Amino acid sequence: MKDKNINSTSFSISKASKAINSYLQLFPEQQWNEVIKITLLFGIDCIQEHFALSTPRIDQLRNIIIHPESSPLDSILTKTPLKNNIINNNQNFNNKINHQHNHNFKYQQDENNNTDDEQEQEQEQQQKQNEIINKITTPIKTPSPPPPPQTSQTSQTSSTSFSIKSNNKTNNNNNNNNNNNNNNNNPFSTITPIHKNHQNSISTSSSKQLRSSLKNTPSKFAFFTSSTSSENNNNNNKNINNGNNNNNNDGGDINRNDSSSNNNNNTHNSTLFIDDDDGDNNDEINDENDINSNNLTFSSSTKSKKINNNNNSIDSNNTNINNNNNNYNNSINKLSGRESKVEFNEDRNQYSIYSRGDTSSSNNSDLIFENNNNNNSSIYNESATQVEIFYDKNGQPINHLYQEFQFQQHQNGDQNNNSQFLDESMLKSNNSSNNNNNNKNNNNNNNNNNNNNNNNNNNSSSNRNSSINNGNNQSSLFYNSASTNQNNNNNNITTSLNYKVISSPLKNLNLNPTTTNEQISKSVNFDRNQNQKSPFLNNTSMPNINFNEQSQQQSQNQYYQQQQQQQQQQSNNSMNQSINYKDINPSFLSSTPLEFNDTVDTSGSSLKYSTSSNNSKGFSNISNNSKKIFDKSNFNLGSMGNSSFGMSNFNSTSFGASTGGASHLTHTFHNNGNSDGDDDQSNNSNSLFYTPRSTHIMNSMNSNFNHHHNNNNQLFNNSGSNKQMGFPIPPNAVPIHNHTHHHYHNGKGNNTDQELEIIDLEDQPTRFNNKNNNNSNGFTSNKRFYNQH
């Protein structure tokens, strides 16, 4: 032979087959199995040395040789998803061999013309190998048959259980024995399903993973909404999953048979997956493209987590509120802008949600809504809508985002300063409900990329809420909750406040009277009780969803599947449009729909703003000291409410420009004829919540929340029939910067101050200094929140 090296490419499969057949002819047929086994075992040490194989691998090879009937190959091919891969690999290997045969064809022809000397050399070497084997084992003493001619080119088959054919494989010791009795040594064993009553827990390090994974989050993201449902399931937890498990082609859920008691709390958990819009025609949140593109949504842990995305200037803040006195525990899960806060007044069951835009961009959006519970038991059973505008890392508005903020029962938030948003029992409710022993809890969960689709309802003995937190470097701008409760009280109330969030750019809203219809043609209309339409969603109607009906879930999926073609990024060009948010009408706000409209009269020295609702009155006359305040600021100012708000009582001088320039808008809430004598309007340094984008230096602002002299005209009002006032913050308002102090002075005819101090520092609490505990219209002293960055 030309090359005796085993590594030579000339040593082909056909040649090896020929050598093996010739080798076996030296032994009786009865000994062939034993000869093959001994030969393979003898060569393992050489193989280990030659290929530097690990000991476990060598042990596995020995086990296969000794017990070929337990080889995992057949099990792998029939029981795991790797079947196609193995077959393809075999096919590729065969193709490679065929290709190799073509290269060896010439040499094989030469081989057929080998001289007698070369054949004798081969026979001598085979004889030496046989002598070595004879030293290891004692063959059965039976007369050996005469050796066949060496020129035979075909394999000799036999009736025994072992035979060799070129490029062929047969099982020995029962052909049909494909059992894998060695699963522990099978690296390709199938995934073990989650056992009954077993729940996977996610480590607290997930928050760090999520925080770090958000650094390069694309502006495109998945989103979906849900609604709560009520069921009495007789102490059963139901984990319902609409498929979407990558490793289960049957659309099932790994833990779909799981059922466990929940301390008399009946929780119905539904998982809804919709179009993730990642361009791969796969409507699963957890598909591979999502994993590779960091485009997955994630469910937050009930521990409050601050997830900071420096590139996109987006924070996801999870707020947990708990009041143990009446087992009414709520949580706010919200996706916010740069800064967010939630204010509560326990004495009056009141809360305010306030979110700011991006401090690093001029495209800021600020909005604030306050709520006055007023002991209305139906308040938290209705949906309320807050409008927020979010921006991507390029400063462009994120053009579509719906989200539901769910108020659900939770325990207190995490006390870790690195993740805490609210750390005290914030909300007290006197609501009554007949929903005894009935928890309504809807979880929107996404499975992780480890083939586990978990509705993780891990109710621990510590009464601490637990939920799935899909880490694994999954990230998204969408933020939703997944939670359950554990309380031993049979009168737990879990209701939800659904926040539908729609973004819309108001960056360059043209307030010129010559604005054309085309410039303001796009509008956003909300109707809480009917279909909801948005130009950013191609005016596609979104059906109302009832999670008690599977058909409604399907319609929700169908709705989102229609959104694959929608525009993902707004143009950098200026967009001029009006925004009308109609028929939102949350019960705790007023009986009048809230409407934002850009009907602004810029003529003369007075700027007028009004809303179209018959009962809703806006700022009828805004004085700007002969300067047009809105000319440079380019923002839309609105109000909500009806005549009971007292907003129509604001006099014409309530809104004046500061002496430092028209770009510093002063807000002084003042009721005509009810002043206690303080000249609030002359204090041009006062500014409520914000200052428009301008040359005004934010660090020099020491804003005042202004005196409210009449109890019926309080910013946070709870007297008589007056409803809570909500104040929209202009989108171009510059969020308050570091060390800015706000003082909320609440007087009852004697100018008694109650100070609200906001210290805008990372992970530092804001102190509510209560100077008048007897003032029912003011803040109480136990309120703390963080101004998130």
Swiss-Prot record:
Residues 107-326, 426-491, 523-625, 666-751, 765-789 are annotated as: Disordered. This is Uncharacterized protein DDB_G0286591. Residues 124-141, 151-194, 201-213, 225-270, 291-326, 429-491, 550-581, 602-617, 696-722, 766-789 have a biased composition (Low complexity). It comes from the Eukaryota. Disulfide bonds: none annotated. Residues 113-123, 274-290 have a biased composition (Acidic residues). Residues 523-549 have a biased composition (Polar residues). It comes from Dictyostelium discoideum (Social amoeba).
